[in-house]
A protein has these predicted regions:
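Glycine-rich phosphate-binding/hydrolytic loop that grips phosphoryl groups
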Residues: 134-136, 243-281
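Phosphate/pyrophosphate-binding loops at sites that engage ATP/ADP/AMP, CoA/4′-phosphopantetheine
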Residues: 47-60, 198-210
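Phosphate/ATP-binding catalytic cores across multiple sugar-kinase/actin-like superfamilies
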Residues: 189-208, 254, 308-317
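Short glycine-rich, Thr/Ser-proximal phosphate-binding strand/loop in the N-terminal lobe
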Residues: 4-42, 46-49, 120, 124, ...
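Short beta-strand-loop/turn "lid" adjacent to the catalytic site in phosphate-handling enzymes
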Residues: 26, 30-36, 51-85, 112-121
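Adenine-nucleotide phosphate-binding core of ATP-dependent small-molecule kinases
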Residues: 169-200
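Glycine-rich phosphate-binding loop plus the immediately following alpha-helix
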Residues: 116-157, 247, 256-260, 352
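Glycine-rich phosphate-binding loops at beta-strand->alpha-helix junctions
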Residues: 68-69, 203-232, 243-250
Length: 352
């Protein structure tokens, strides 16, 4: 068995991919943060290729987390770590003085209460007040998230803006734009809307006090957003926990969940794997990843509308060695009705 000395944490979220390479003593060796633009597997493959080239032959113990990583966990042969577990592990190791952690991601927001037992608050049904919401509002002002931050630094007035939904927010922002409101004021107001959505929608009256850490990409890269949180919560400078690698925090926690640090439990022993092997396992594109089983029509039982022949991946093209099926079927399972169609090789409907 190879020596356990280096640990890799992967965090594949809804809009970004992060990785953290950590030594046995908890020291961060390498970190990456990339927007994947929905090309999840291609981005991950590129990141792992670059890491394998930089550290040839390096063996690591690895784990993965994130909202877009469940299928990749199986593809890469890596254990899946819950985001909350990874986040709390990173905080416990790197900032144990933290009482409350506020984290914003691409499409989720979390508040972790840590000082009196673990209590997690997380948005459930809407991405309002998250990184995706900020991107959408930035586009409305013809800029990006960084541009929104630069504008907000020079604001003079805050306007009330809805943040539960991007559609509702637009109904507030567009009239203000038409009335001549300054873009700087609108940018700061959008950040304030994110703050109010997070505090009002997640804290639900539970006070955010003590030592507070601000985590996740939006709160790391947008200091004006962080300032709006600090001002709204009336935090003194000594109450804000410094977290220099806040954008990698969950990836760090995923790696640290594998590290055998004093006084902290870790995951069960795993056989290390080389970075090159991980890079080879990663599909170069989404098309190469496994697809759900398809439903195929039985040619031996023509009276049966559909039989579930579980075939993983895209059905092969017709050829002389793999003739086109004589019949094919599809089903539409709606909320109140079920529809099914049986068609021949030319697409003509046989029955429905």
């Amino acid at each position: 068995m190879m020596e356990r000395s280096v640990f890799l944490g992967l965090d594949i979220g809804s809009t970004t991919a992060k990785l953290a390479l950590v030594a046995a003593d908890g020291k961060l060796l390498e970190a990456q943060y990339l927007r994947h633009g929905a090309a999840v597997r291609q981005t991950l493959s590129t990141m792992l290729d670059q890491l394998a080239l930089k550290y040839p032959g390096m063996a690591v113990s690895a784990a993965i987390t994130g909202s877009a990583s469940l299928g990749l966990s199986e593809t890469l042969g890596l254990p899946f770590v819950q985001e909350v577990v990874a986040a709390s592990r990173a905080i416990a190791v790197l900032a144990p003085q933290t009482d409350v952690a506020v984290e914003l991601g691409g499409e989720d927001a979390k508040i972790l209460y840590l000082s009196q037992g673990m209590d997690l608050r997380m948005n459930e049904a809407c991405a309002g007040g998250t990184g995706a919401f900020i991107d959408q509002m930035a586009a409305l002002l013809h800029t990006d998230a960084s541009g929104l931050n630069e504008l907000a630094a020079n604001y003079t007035t805050l306007y009330p803006i809805a943040s539960r939904c991007g559609v509702f927010a637009k109904t507030d922002v567009v009239p203000l734009l038409n009335e001549g409101a300054a873009r700087e004021d609108l940018a700061a107001s959008i950040f304030q809307a994110v703050v109010e959505q997070t505090i009002g929608g997640l804290a639900c009256g539970n006070p955010i006090r003590g030592k507070v850490a601000f985590l996740g990409g939006p709160l790391h890269f947008l200091p004006e957003l962080r300032k709006r949180f600090i001002a709204t919560l009336k935090l003194a400078p000594e109450e804000v926990v410094p977290f220099p690698n806040a954008q990698y925090m969950v990836a760090l926690g995923t790696a640290l969940s594998l590290v055998d640090l004093p006084g902290a439990a870790r995951m069960a022993d795993m056989e290390p794997v080389t970075l090159g092997t991980l890079a080879e396992r990663a599909p170069a594109s989404d098309a190469e990843d496994r697809r759900p089983p398809s439903l195929r029509c039985s040619t031996t039982k023509p009276t049966t509308i559909c039989s579930a022949n579980a075939t993983t991946g895209t059905p092969p093209r017709a050829s002389r060695w793999n003739p086109r099926p004589a019949r094919s079927s599809s089903a539409d399972l709606g909320s109140t009705t079920v529809k099914a169609v049986l068609a021949d090789a030319d697409g003509a409907v046989l029955t429905s």
